[in-house]
């Protein structure tokens, strides 16, 4: 009796038994050995976490095993059961996390075999032709043991070859939006109503390339019964709105990597000036970060990426780089070098790093502080994975302190400044012990960069910049781009802006405690005291005391200062003690001080029992504000809004596109969504950047006449229209339920009649066209009236015509001037001549010429 081969798939995911004897063999124990208790259960339990438990058919499971998959990735484990159940999905996963197989395996499982009469049943939209080609190869490998036909529709290939592929009735189309819209405009018979499975791959990139309008056009041509899947690395606001409109009760699938910071990640915040960032970055890369550790550096614009790339190469460091406008081939080369550990530094922007999955990173450097807390978590979430430790270094300027407070309110982590140099000189061991305890408790300590180190490194950087013409040429573009970045990034909360003014002065960061000695600490303490020095006397008082003269106004100023200093100290004390009960502050104020501060008004006193007190502000207020959760919307909308993350573009054109733009049709400035384009020609933009008009060019008809073939996917028969999801089953229209008849077709009255209802844009365009026609007719009538008047004045002209116009004969009577072609002008020339101007000779002639 045959035993089950452990290497073969289980009975649930593999091929079913063909005979009853083989089916009974599973339940009979082996002869000579009793079956151990729980033996079969242990085998099923060992494979319960793999693809065997997903109920895949034999062909699909063999393709998965042939590809080399054994255990599903986290995104596959979460998304595939929901997709197989028929739900719409909005999933957020980085590149390299296995998301391609997460939607390809359920698609092949659903289609299984080729159906020539069903039309196009699956559609996958990719932002670039490279990604579409990669998806095609992946789908062919997974569907190796099926007879499904897959067609690739991307720009750069000939339309005729793609017509031939579409004429073979493919089951799956992998396309870029620009070329697909071109096919829909060219081929009338190409119908997407039969599509039942739609995937928007790298949806955030689709929107950033300006393909929003094309995606909406494609979405309107699909059936309402389709299953829509949306995979993205991040979720911009425009993409969230698209998901609300295009997905039906979507399930939000996201990994927990972006929701929290790893406990093994160390945070280091350095306060410095903007011009000191170069020196601080070079010091960190050379001295603090090991050469065996991989580091990713986030900057704001592509100009900073190019500047740092040249600077590092001048300093003997070879980095990799990536930004949004970079060529795809060059970007892949740089990323491959970094993944292969040929380079240890990667300089990127937020737009280029979106969806980038690089395992085993050691350090992250934030050159510019992220404007949103979720963006900070998105950056540093790449470090300290899989039990490894890592460090996130962040440069903080004075303008970024409010963002620092917003971040720690979002993370619910306490923030404290590093002890000053004076405090360290008084009790260095006690302060160091205090800081170590704070760091062990999860608190964040921020401090200054040593000024001596910055001054030393800055001198070398200036010499390098002055000796490199490329760096000199990039300085001004970097400055201008950074100013534009500051204008376009979101503002911090007003509460954090107000609290920044009351923050105490920070000292040297604890990471540099071993770098400086006691003498250098004393020098730094002295310089900090000079910075904070404020004279206690006005210039008049100082001059009066220097003159050693008695002046009654000096005594008045001293008394005034004594009174006002007490009041000022009380106000500062009141502002600093916000969380203490008000009655404690009232008890500490004497009668005369209370009179000076509050006047004769009675002080409002309150009593608060901390055990039973319920605050009107929730404890997770800042977390909810950071996630932008709206309570007045549904649960799905809240989950989508909580995942929204808009990124500031890394180049000037993208930053300007995020601001208001002048709309040529509305004749006013409008706010555009991310990735929208305003074009006056009505052209569509393909993934290669080419602009095409979405109108017929006659290519399809020429191909039909040449090959005598046609594309009949999604055929229509008179009033019958193919109804999307499946060839059998039922559909619902209004409140009445109908059963599908005859090969999945149902009768729809007037299905081919175009709609006569025009939208406001069409009405406005027709009015403008009508006004232009009227103006053109008026202009034409004015020209005709002038021409008729000219003909009337020149009736007796019998001379030659040139280009349909009368020749102006300036000398009809010899050398005389005559501006009328009939010879009735005055002649002032010498010699004899007739009225036709053919005479020669000498003499004077005055008078009117006659014919």
From Swiss-Prot:
EC number(s) reported in the record: 3.6.4.13
Residue segments, region Disordered: 1-49, 719-851
Bias type Basic and acidic residues, positions: 24-42, 773-787, 796-825
Gene Ontology CC terms: nucleolus
Domain Helicase ATP-binding: 80-253
Annotated CDD domains: SF2_C_DEAD
Domain Helicase C-terminal: 277-426
Entry superkingdom: Eukaryota
Reaction equation(s) it catalyzes: ATP + H2O = ADP + phosphate + H(+)
Composition bias, Low complexity: 7-20
Segments of skewed composition (Basic residues): 733-746, 841-851
GO molecular function, a single term: ATP binding
Binding site for ATP: 93-100
Gene Ontology BP annotations: rRNA processing
Keyword vocabulary terms for this entry: ATP-binding, Helicase, Hydrolase, Nucleotide-binding, RNA-binding
Q motif, short sequence motif: residues: 49-77
Annotated motif DEAD box, positions: 201-204
Alphabetical list of SUPFAM superfamilies matching this protein: P-loop containing nucleoside triphosphate hydrolases
Family, per entry: Belongs to the DEAD box helicase family. DDX54/DBP10 subfamily.
Domain observations: The Q motif is unique to and characteristic of the DEAD box family of RNA helicases and controls ATP binding and hydrolysis.
PANTHER family: ATP-DEPENDENT RNA HELICASE RHLE-RELATED (PTHR47959), RNA HELICASE (PTHR47959:SF8)
The protein, known as: DEAD-box ATP-dependent RNA helicase 29
Species per Swiss-Prot/TrEMBL record: Oryza sativa subsp. japonica (Rice)
């Amino acid at each position: 009796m045959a035993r089950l081969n452990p290497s073969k798939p289980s009975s649930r995911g593999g091929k079913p038994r063909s005979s009853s004897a083989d089916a009974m063999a599973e339940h009979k124990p082996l002869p000579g050995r009793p079956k151990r208790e729980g033996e079969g259960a242990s085998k099923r339990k060992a494979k319960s976490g793999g693809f065997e438990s997903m109920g895949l058919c034999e062909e699909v499971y063999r393709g998965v095993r042939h590809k080399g998959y054994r255990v599903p990735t986290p995104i596959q484990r979460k998304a595939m059961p929901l997709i197989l159940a028929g739900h719409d999905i909005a999933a957020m996963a980085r590149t390299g996390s296995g998301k391609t197989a997460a939607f390809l395996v359920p698609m092949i499982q659903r289609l299984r075999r080729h159906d020539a009469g069903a039309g196009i049943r699956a559609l996958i939209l990719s932002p670039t032709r490279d990604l579409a080609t990669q998806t095609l190869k992946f789908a062919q490998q997974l569907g190796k043991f099926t007879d499904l036909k897959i067609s690739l529709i991307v720009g750069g290939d000939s339309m005729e070859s793609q017509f031939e592929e579409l004429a073979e009735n493919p089951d799956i189309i992998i396309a870029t939006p620009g070329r697909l819209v071109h096919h829909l405009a060219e081929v009338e018979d190409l119908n997407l109503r039969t599509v039942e499975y739609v995937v928007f791959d790298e949806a955030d990139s689709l929107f950033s390339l300006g393909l929003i309008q094309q995606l909406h056009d494609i979405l309107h041509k699909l059936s309402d019964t389709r299953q829509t899947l949306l995979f993205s690395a991040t979720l911009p606001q425009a993409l969230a709105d698209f998901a609300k409109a295009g997905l039906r009760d979507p399930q939000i699938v996201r990994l927990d990597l972006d929701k929290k910071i790893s406990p093994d990640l160390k945070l280091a915040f350095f306060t410095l000036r903007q011009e000191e960032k170069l020196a601080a970055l070079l010091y960190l890369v050379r001295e603090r970060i090991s050469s065996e550790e991989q580091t990713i550096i986030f900057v704001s614009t592509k100009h900073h990426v190019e500047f740092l790339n040249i600077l590092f190469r001048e300093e003997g460091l070879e980095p990799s780089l990536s930004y949004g406008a970079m060529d795809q081939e060059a970007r892949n080369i740089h990323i491959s070098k970094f993944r292969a550990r040929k380079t240890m530094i990667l300089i990127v922007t937020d737009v280029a790093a979106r969806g980038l999955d690089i395992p085993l990173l050691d350090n992250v450097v934030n050159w510019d502080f992220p404007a949103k807390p979720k963006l900070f978590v998105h950056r540093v979430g790449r470090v300290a994975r899989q039990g490894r430790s890592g460090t996130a270094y962040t440069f903080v300027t004075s303008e970024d302190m409010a963002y620092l407070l917003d971040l720690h309110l979002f993370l619910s982590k306490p923030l404290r400044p590093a002890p000053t140099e004076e405090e360290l000189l008084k009790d260095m061991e006690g302060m160091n012990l205090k800081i170590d305890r704070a760091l062990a408790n999860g608190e964040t300590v921020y401090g200054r960069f040593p000024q001596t180190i910055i001054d030393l490194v800055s001198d070398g950087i200036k010499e390098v910049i002055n000796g490199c013409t490329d760096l000199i040429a990039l300085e001004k573009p970097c400055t201008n781009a950074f100013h534009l970045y500051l204008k376009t990034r979101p503002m911090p909360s007003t509460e954090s802006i107000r609290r920044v003014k009351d923050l105490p002065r920070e000292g040297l960061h604890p990471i540099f405690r071993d770098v400086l000695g006691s003498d250098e600490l004393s020098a730094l303490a002295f310089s900090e005291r000079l910075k904070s020095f404020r004279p206690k006397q006005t210039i008049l008082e100082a001059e009066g005391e220097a003159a050693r003269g008695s002046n009654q106004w000096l005594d008045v100023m001293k008394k005034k200062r004594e009174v006002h200093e007490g009041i000022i100290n009380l106000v500062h004390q009141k502002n600093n003690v916000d969380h203490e009960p008000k009655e404690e502050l009232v008890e500490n104020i004497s009668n005369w001080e209370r009179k000076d501060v509050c006047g004769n008004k009675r002080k409002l006193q309150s009593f608060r029992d901390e055990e039973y007190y319920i605050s009107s502000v929730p404890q997770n207020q800042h977390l909810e504000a950071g996630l932008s959760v709206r309570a007045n919307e549904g649960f799905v909308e809240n989950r989508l809004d909580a995942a929204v993350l808009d990124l500031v573009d890394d180049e000037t054109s993208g930053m300007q596109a995020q601001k208001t733009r002048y709309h040529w049709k509305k004749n006013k400035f409008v706010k555009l969504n991310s990735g929208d384009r305003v074009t006056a020609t009505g052209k569509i933009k393909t993934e290669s950047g080419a602009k095409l008009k979405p109108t017929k060019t006659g290519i399809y008809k020429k191909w039909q006449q040449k090959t005598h073939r046609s594309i009949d996917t999604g055929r229509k028969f008179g009033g019958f229209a193919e109804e999307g999801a499946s060839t059998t089953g039922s559909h619902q229209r209004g409140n009445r339920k109908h059963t599908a008849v005859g090969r999945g077709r149902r009768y729809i009255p007037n299905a081919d009649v175009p709609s006569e209802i025009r939208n406001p844009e069409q009405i406005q365009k027709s009015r403008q066209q009508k006004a232009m026609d009227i103006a053109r007719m008026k202009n034409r009538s004015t020209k005709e009236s002038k021409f008729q008047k000219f003909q009337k004045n020149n009736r007796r002209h019998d001379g030659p015509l040139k280009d349909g116009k009368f020749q102006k004969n300036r000398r009809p009577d010899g050398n005389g001037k005559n501006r009328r072609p009939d010879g009735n002008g005055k002649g002032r020339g010498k010699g004899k001549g007739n009225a036709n101007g053919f005479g020669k000779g000498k003499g004077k002639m005055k008078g009117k010429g006659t014919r």
